[in-house]
A protein has these predicted regions:
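C-terminal effector/interaction modules appended to NTPase cores
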Residues: 1-120
């Protein structure tokens, strides 16, 4: 699955950030919040970056879209639909979440380069 379009799928997630773990909730809309997801029952850190989402408040569900950061080197298959995960910043678990769905990037068909016909 590494390097495939399926591994590049944007993840639609529901997340909850716990109070007492951060001073303020993260901004999911800045495009700069890049935590790790660790799927329940595994230990592998899966780096993601939030593209957008709803405003976060502590201990309340928020919705967001996250993109895998390393689709060419790490297998993101464990983040399948309904997978539950913890959200880590470094070694600290700051929240939890669940995958609601995935959007695989649309494959764009290559256009043929037009070359004018030149008779001999």
């Amino acid at each position: 699955m590494i390097g495939t379009d399926e591994n590049r799928a944007v993840l639609h997630v529901e997340v909850i950030f716990w109070s007492g773990k951060r001073k303020i909730p993260p901004s999911l809309v800045s495009g700069k919040y890049c935590p790790h997801f660790v799927v329940t029952g595994t230990t592998e850190y899966l780096g993601v970056c939030f593209l957008d989402g709803t405003e976060c408040t502590f201990d309340t569900p928020a919705l967001g879209n996250a993109q895998p950061l390393y689709p060419d080197t790490i297998d993101y298959a464990p983040l399948e639909n309904n997978a539950e995960f913890l959200i880590y910043e470094g070694a600290n678990a700051v929240g939890k979440g669940r995958v609601l769905g995935r959007t695989v990037p649309y494959k764009v068909k290559q256009q043929r380069k037009w070359v004018p016909y030149v008779p001999n």
